[in-house]
Structure formats: C-alpha cells, structure tokens
Amino acid sequence: MGIHSLLYCERLFYLEEVEGILVADDRVYAGRTLHEELEPNEDSSGRIESFHYTSEKLEVSGKVDRIQKRDGDWIPYEHKRGRARIGTNGPEAWESDQCQVTVYALLLEEATGRNISEGKIRYHGSKDLVKIEIDEELRSKALKTIDRAKGLSTSTNRPPVAQNENLCKNCSLAPVCLPEETRVITENEYEPIRLFPEKREKTTLHVFGHDSRIKKSDNVLLVEKVTETGEKSKSEKIPIQEIESVNIHGNCQISSQMIKFLVSEEIPVHWFSGGGNYIGGININPSGVQRRIRQFKALTKETIRLNLAKKLVSAKCESQLRYLLRATRGKDETRNETESYLATIRSGLKNIESADSPSQLLGIEGSSARAYFSGLPALLKNSDPFLVPNGRSKRPPKDPFNATLSFLYSLLYKSVRQAIIAVGLDPSFGFYHTPRSSAEPLVLDLMELFRVSLCDMTLIGSINRKSWIDEDFEITKNKVWLSESGRKKATQLYETRLDDTWKHPVVNYSLSYYRMIELEVRLLEKEWSGEANIFAQARLR
C-alpha cells in the first residue's frame, strides 16, 4: 500500500509504489527478519496472523501483521523494528505509523462491518506497546493520504527530493533518488554527503572457450573445463549471491535451465563472439514504464537532444585533449609532435557551443577523433612497433592495437548497456547517435564518456608496460583479432580498470568507474526530470 513511505517522503513512495523500484538494504532485511521470526502465541483463539484485504471502496490493499479480538472488538496490530517516539506522557507512535494503522482499521471495518476504535503498535527497538485511538482526526488524515497516493500513482513525473535532508541518510533508495546530487544543483555551496555506493559489491564472471561448461550445484555456480574425451580437467566455484553478471565468450556451453535460473536470480547474461564482438544479452529490465515515458517525451524534443549532444561531444573531445596533454607533459619532443593534433581538438571544442545540428557536432567529433588517434602513436615511442597503430581501423581492425581497442569497446558497450537497463531506460532510444546498425543508440551515446578513461588509457598503459606477446593475437591478410589468451588479458585489464576509483569534480566524492557508469545514466535521467546540469560534467584531470 505504501502509506508509511508516502508520509515519510512522497518521492520514496513514487519510486517504490509507482515505478516499482525496491532496494533491500540492512534495515529492510532486518525488518523482514523481524516479521519472519515473530512466532504466534500458542493460544491463537480470537487472533489472526497476517491479515490481507483489498478494498474496492478505498481502492487500496493492505496486509496487517496481526488482528486480535478483545471484548468482541477487532484490534489491528503492527510490528516495527525501530523505537517509539518519546512524548510528554511516555512512548508515542510516530505520525506515519499512526496513519498506517488507521488505514488498516478502515480496511478491517470494511471487511468485518464493525467499527474499529483502536490499534496497537509494538516497537521492538524500545520494547514499547503503543495504543492508537482511531478518532475522526486520524480517519480524515488517512483518507487524505490515500487520495494523495492515488494522485501520485497516475502521474509520470517524480515528486521533488525531500526538503529534510536527514530523511535521505537512512533511505534505501538514496542511490536511485540521488538527493544529494540534486541539492548540489539547487543549493549554493552545498557540500554533499555520499549516499551513492563507491564500488561494485559482486564479481563479474567471464567464461572463455568451447571447452567450458557452466553448471549449478546447490547455490554455487560451477565453471568446468572439459577435455576432448569428455573428462573434467578442472572447475571454478563461485557462490551465486556473489555474481554480478555472467559473460560468455565464444561457444561455452550453458543450458536453458541454467539461463532460466540466472534470470530468476536477476543476474544478467551476456554473449560475445569468438572474435570479441558483443552479440547480445539478457538483462533484468525493472518495472516502471514511467521512466521510459519520460525518456521518450524528452528525447523527441530537438532542443533537448541537441543540448545533451553538445554536453556529450564536449566531454569526449575534452577528455581526448586532456589525455594527450597529460601523456606528453614534460616531454618536449613528444609534445611538439602532437601540437598540430592538439590544436585541431582545441579548435573543435571552441565550435561545439555554436553548433546548431547533430550533423555539425558529428563533423567536429570526427575531426577531433582523427587528430586524437593520429597523436596516439607518439605515446608509444618505446614500444614494440608491432603494437603501434597507424590511425584508427575497425570492421575489421587492421593491427593488434585496433583489434584490442575494439574488444575493449565491446566490453564497455556491455557495461553501459547493462547500466542503462538496470536504471530502467530504453537503450535503443538515444539523443546523438542514429540507429544505423544493431548497436543501440543510447548505449553508443553514453560510451563516449568512458572510451578514453576506460579503454584508450588502459590499452596504452598496458602496451608501455610490455604486457602483450605475439601469441595474444591472430593475424590474417585482411584482419587482426585477439586470441583467447589475448581476450582474457584484455578482459582482466578492463575489469581492473573498472575498480579504479576517481573523484567526481561536481559531486565531490570518489567512486569506482564501475559505479561512475551507473551514476552518469542516473544523472542523464535527471536532465529531463527538472534536475539538470550534472550529466557529462566529469573530466580527466
């Protein structure tokens, strides 16, 4: 029913009850455990545990923890994990708890046809039992709250963040709501506190090779290596609850039953070809069509699309410029070699704001990209010439550098796509790239924010550390691609980079690149939710 969350915060009610977003933190789990551990009294006469009723008159439904019959009258009981409020005459029920029990009383009256004059709340944190007198004032407030809930349920727009910032500190949905990030925009010199998680909490599993088989034993995922004779050579065991996603490279064997189980556990599954291309995936798409309605409405407006595209292209070109500047700092000869390329990128940056169409932005971006990739070989002077590129080549890549970079971009595509779907947006409806291939436009849009930091810098750093050998590549006349050992190496480099932390210059807290991808998707959603101006503001130092 959500009455309690509505009185706590209207935005919380909307996220949970309308958009269907539920995040279970320690407090939520503790509340569930409390209700599971409550044992009924041996003498259960005149008592019903867990009474559920749907009212056609009020158009709400509710589940009462317990109803007890005393002197011929039914009394609704509610259990709370926390502590009672300290009043002038002793323990009192919190306002939201009073309203919740009153709504239960209204449901019980409709179900029994009898007047309900009182309810009780057990606060287990303070061990207090508080009596609630169901008077006309409480009934009136409960009915007004129900009407407000109905009104919010028909809206496609989220309510604003709570004015009382203390409410947000203990809210399980703060990482979705991002109230602190909103206050950074709306309040001058506001110092946000971190409510968004810093790092990923689970393991991303990558499985390579046709000789690999994915199975399940109890609540453990097994990755078995099978020889040509059918014998098991070795196996890897990972607890299901520790897996963030399963990524299958090549023709690894996985049964439909295993896929069904992973989906039921809300674990995404992704497939890559033996050549390293992203094929597709099964992502858990959360409920809440309101998010996609807001997305579609916003991105059909040319002014919004162009404004977002300018932010995106500016962020990408500036990242390319800053990386070249940083990599050539203190190296006069190398800086001189790249100066003309730096000038081209600087010139493009000056023209972004005056661009009046996506095609102009594409021209600026393309010119900057050619200059950027022309300058990258200067950063690899002491490396094996075998690994030094001659510009950017793709579909197919012509050299080991471009083959590795294309594979890293495929891994990035997967990460961005998974984050977009997890947030509840539609990856096929973007604002900059046009749908000209199987690649989804919004994924391509958001990838631009991370190509330099997650892929380009990672690859160049690994080449300068001499991490690659000839056996990591398979070379033909017309194409170069990574061998299995090369794809494993690139994957390890990418996943390690995702865990690196970086301080966001606007929200002023550090988080991993893995979390940064999710944060940017959520900040993008704020652009058309009345809370704009943080999306695509992060820059390399």
From Swiss-Prot:
Q: Where is this region: CRISPR-associated endonuclease Cas1?
A: 204-541
Listed A to Z, the keywords are: 4Fe-4S, Antiviral defense, DNA-binding, Endonuclease, Exonuclease, Hydrolase, Iron, Iron-sulfur, Magnesium, Manganese, Metal-binding, Nuclease
Q: What is the E.C. number?
A: 3.1.-.-, 3.1.12.1
What residues does Mn(2+) 2 bind to?
Answer: E365, H433, E448
Query: Entry's Gene3D superfamilies?
Result: 3.90.320.10, CRISPR-associated endonuclease Cas1, C-terminal domain, CRISPR-associated endonuclease Cas1, N-terminal domain
Q: Name one GO biological process term.
A: maintenance of CRISPR repeat elements
Catalytic reactions of this protein: exonucleolytic cleavage in the 5'- to 3'-direction to yield nucleoside 3'-phosphates
Record's keyword annotation contains Methyltransferase = no
Q: Which cofactor does it need?
A: [4Fe-4S] cluster; Mg(2+); Mn(2+)
**Source organism, top-level taxon:** Bacteria
Cite the cofactor comment: Binds 1 [4Fe-4S] cluster per subunit.
Q: Which residues bind [4Fe-4S] cluster?
A: C9, C168, C171, C177
Pfam families the UniProt entry points to: Cas_Cas1 (PF01867), Cas_Cas4 (PF01930)
InterPro entries found in the cross-reference section: Cas1, CRISPR-assoc_Cas1, CRISPR-assoc_Cas1_C, CRISPR-assoc_Cas1_MYXAN, CRISPR-assoc_Cas1_N, CRISPR-assoc_prot_Cas4, Dna2/Cas4_DUF83, PDDEXK-like_dom_sf
Which molecular-function annotations from GO does this UniProt entry contain? 4 iron, 4 sulfur cluster binding; DNA binding; DNA endonuclease activity; endonuclease activity; exonuclease activity; metal ion binding
Q: Where is this region: CRISPR-associated exonuclease Cas4?
A: 1-179
Family membership, please give it. In the N-terminal section; belongs to the CRISPR-associated exonuclease Cas4 family. In the C-terminal section; belongs to the CRISPR-associated endonuclease Cas1 family.
* Role this protein plays: CRISPR (clustered regularly interspaced short palindromic repeat), is an adaptive immune system that provides protection against mobile genetic elements (viruses, transposable elements and conjugative plasmids). CRISPR clusters contain spacers, sequences complementary to antecedent mobile elements, and target invading nucleic acids. CRISPR clusters are transcribed and processed into CRISPR RNA (crRNA). The Cas4 region acts as a ssDNA exonuclease, while the Cas1 region acts as a dsDNA endonuclease. Involved in the integration of spacer DNA into the CRISPR cassette.
Subunit structure and binding partners: Homodimer, forms a heterotetramer with a Cas2 homodimer.
- Identify the NCBIfam families for this entry: cas1, cas1_MYXAN, cas4
Q: What is this protein called?
A: CRISPR-associated exonuclease Cas4/endonuclease Cas1 fusion
Species in which this protein is naturally found: Leptospira interrogans serogroup Icterohaemorrhagiae serovar Lai (strain 56601)
